[in-house]
């Protein structure tokens, strides 16, 4: 089956609150139920964060994206999409539970927030990526 989902445009902004917006900078990947984006946001004191944003957007439900970035579902599929969104939220809860398990040292993602916007659900995940250059940051002080 061809993947005809329309991703959020680069530069699209999702408003979390009055002072926190998430800006889409890239598409990172796709799964059967989601599209994952690279994104940035500035926290309440202006510090920039690189994050991943996972959008609940199942390929097999033939959703369409409106100009305002909301997802529309065909008549008769609303309940199925609501069930999928609930399972998406349950996976977030499970990931948080795994992340918080004491003694577990192999966590694959760091889920941080659930966002309900655009008639769908997003999972905000922190991005822990770097290289040996981090030593320079600490030795410079």
Model-derived segments and spans:
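Juxta-kinase regulatory segment immediately upstream of eukaryotic protein kinase catalytic domains
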Residues: 1-19, 23-26
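Conserved alphaC helix of the protein kinase catalytic domain
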Residues: 26, 93-100
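Short hydrophobic-acidic sequence motifs that mark active-site Asp/Glu residues
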Residues: 50-52, 108, 124
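Short beta-strand micro-motifs within the conserved protein kinase catalytic domain, predominantly
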Residues: 102-121
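A conserved loop-to-beta-strand element in the N-lobe of protein kinase catalytic cores
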Residues: 117-126, 134-135
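AlphaC helix of the protein kinase catalytic domain
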Residues: 133-141
């Amino acid at each position: 089956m061809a993947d005809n989902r329309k991703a959020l445009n680069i530069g699209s902004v999702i408003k979390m609150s009055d002072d926190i917006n998430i800006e889409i900078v890239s598409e990172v990947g796709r799964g059967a139920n989601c599209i994952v984006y690279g994104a940035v946001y500035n926290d309440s004191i202006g510090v920039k964060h690189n994050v991943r944003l996972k959008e609940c957007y199942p390929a097999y439900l033939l959703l369409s994206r409106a100009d305002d970035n909301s997802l529309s579902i065909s008549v008769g599929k609303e309940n199925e999409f609501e069930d999928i969104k609930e399972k998406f939220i349950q996976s977030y809860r499970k990931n948080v539970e795994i992340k918080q398990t004491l003694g577990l040292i192999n966590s694959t993602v760091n889920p941080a927030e659930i966002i309900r916007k655009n008639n769908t659900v997003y999972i905000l995940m922190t991005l822990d990526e770097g290289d040996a250059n981090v030593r320079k940051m600490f030795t410079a002080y």
